């Protein structure tokens, strides 16, 4: 099922939670809505679900305008962060709930419901636990029950609101891998909300990066990490450093001095680069600063560097350096970005 969000604005007491947002979600796609608190990602998910109504704009399920359809009419599956399982029901009854409460005309026969529950128990690796109650399950198992319940009704779209937020790091990582396999097996169009970058980049076919009620960028994990299209995306996704620079005659200058890299255009801008995208150098045209700390991180080292700022608070950067590099605390270190992006100042 394709989903199209067209020109959606949502206001709460005149506060614009979303401002003219448009997004095309392909059938069978796994999409992550990623952003900090207050970015509008959960509001967008709730609008797709029908739990909120747009102030302006339309939401299409396929060719049908679903903007004012109820949750039931949209036939979406929704999984919450805190499971929302019925504690007095067994695992099997929780999974079957959405099928059992359907009107009699559309309710499957009991034998078909049992078959569907058995099939889903196998898919979520909970066969043998169907008679247990939620309190007898681990957090990861409960979340899989919640997902099976959402999928049991054969939803047009599956929506997940921070599905792993209540779980510890190890369980989250295991469930991420499992959810990707589950999605590939079922093929449901799936949208999930997260503030966890690693989760979004690992799981999603495409990531929708949001900030202050707007979409900043939509792309694959490679797109948003390697070619961010705004200062916000560059600074929000992964680790990065930034410095104010001037572009003159194709050369990038920092504090009036060339740093050995070139960029088209002219004028003032902000230079962004990632810790892993630098090379140490002895040449004059480079960035340089004093090493304040140096620590081991897996197969590399992270050097923290202070760069003088004309008597003001120094610029603080982190860069990766080779394990065999002679880096001493208090020493001067010279380096250049090997990959970077300069954004013009507005």
Curated annotation (Swiss-Prot):
Subcellular location field: Cell inner membrane
Membrane-topology annotation of the record: Peripheral membrane protein
GO molecular function, one term: ATP hydrolysis activity
Domain called ABC transporter: residue spans: 3-237
Reactions it catalyzes: sulfate(out) + ATP + H2O = sulfate(in) + ADP + phosphate + H(+); thiosulfate(out) + ATP + H2O = thiosulfate(in) + ADP + phosphate + H(+)
EC category name: translocase
Key words, A-Z: ATP-binding, Cell inner membrane, Cell membrane, Membrane, Nucleotide-binding, Sulfate transport, Translocase, Transport
Origin: domain of life: Bacteria
Residues at which ATP binds: 35-42
Cross-referenced InterPro entries: AAA+_ATPase, ABC_SmlMolc_Importer, ABC_transporter-like_ATP-bd, ABC_transporter-like_CS, P-loop_NTPase, Sulph_transpt1, TOBE-like
Enzyme Commission designation: 7.3.2.3
GO cellular-component term (any): ATP-binding cassette (ABC) transporter complex
SMART domains: AAA
Functional description taken from the UniProt entry: Part of the ABC transporter complex CysAWTP involved in sulfate/thiosulfate import. Responsible for energy coupling to the transport system.
Assembly with partners or alone: The complex is composed of two ATP-binding proteins (CysA), two transmembrane proteins (CysT and CysW) and a solute-binding protein (CysP).
UniProt family annotation: Belongs to the ABC transporter superfamily. Sulfate/tungstate importer (TC 3.A.1.6) family.
Protein name per Swiss-Prot or TrEMBL: Sulfate/thiosulfate import ATP-binding protein CysA 1
Species, as recorded: Agrobacterium fabrum (strain C58 / ATCC 33970)
Organism ancestry: Bacteria, Pseudomonadati, Pseudomonadota, Alphaproteobacteria, Hyphomicrobiales
């Amino acid at each position: 099922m394709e989903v199209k969000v067209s020109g959606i604005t949502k206001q709460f007491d005149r506060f614009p939670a979303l401002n003219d947002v448009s997004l095309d979600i392909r059938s069978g796609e796994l999409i992550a809505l990623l952003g900090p608190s207050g970015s509008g990602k959960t509001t967008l998910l709730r609008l797709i679900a029908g739990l909120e109504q747009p102030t302006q704009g339309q939401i299409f399920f396929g060719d049908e305008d679903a903007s004012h359809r109820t949750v039931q009419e949209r036939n979406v599956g929704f999984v919450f962060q805190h499971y929302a399982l019925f504690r007095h029901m067994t695992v099997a009854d929780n999974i079957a709930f959405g099928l059992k409460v359907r009107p009699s005309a559309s309710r499957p026969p009991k034998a078909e419901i049992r078959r569907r529950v058995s099939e889903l128990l196998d898919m979520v690796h909970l066969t043998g636990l169907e008679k247990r109650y939620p309190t007898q399950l681990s957090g990861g198992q409960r979340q899989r029950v919640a997902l099976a319940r959402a999928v049991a009704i054969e939803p047009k779209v599956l929506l997940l609101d921070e599905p792993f937020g209540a779980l510890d790091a190890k369980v989250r990582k295991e469930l991420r891998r499992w959810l990707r396999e589950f999605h590939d097996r079922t093929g449901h169009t799936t949208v999930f909300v997260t503030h966890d970058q690693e989760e979004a980049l690992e799981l999603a076919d495409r990531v929708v990066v949001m900030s202050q009620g707007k979409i900043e960028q939509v792309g694959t994990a490679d797109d948003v990490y390697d070619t961010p299209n705004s200062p916000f995306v560059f600074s929000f996704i992964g680790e990065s450093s930034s410095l104010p620079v001037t572009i003159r005659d194709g050369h990038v200058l920092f504090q009036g001095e060339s740093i050995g890299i070139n960029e088209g255009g002219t004028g003032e801008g902000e230079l962004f680069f990632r810790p892993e995208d630098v090379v140490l150098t002895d040449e004059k045209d480079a960035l340089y600063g004093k090493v304040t700390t140096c620590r081991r991180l897996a197969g590399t080292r992270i050097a923290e560097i202070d760069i003088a700022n004309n008597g003001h608070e120094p610029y603080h950067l982190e860069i990766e350096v080779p394990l065999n590099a002679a880096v001493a605390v208090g020493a001067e270190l010279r380096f250049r970005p090997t990959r970077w992006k300069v954004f013009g100042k507005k």
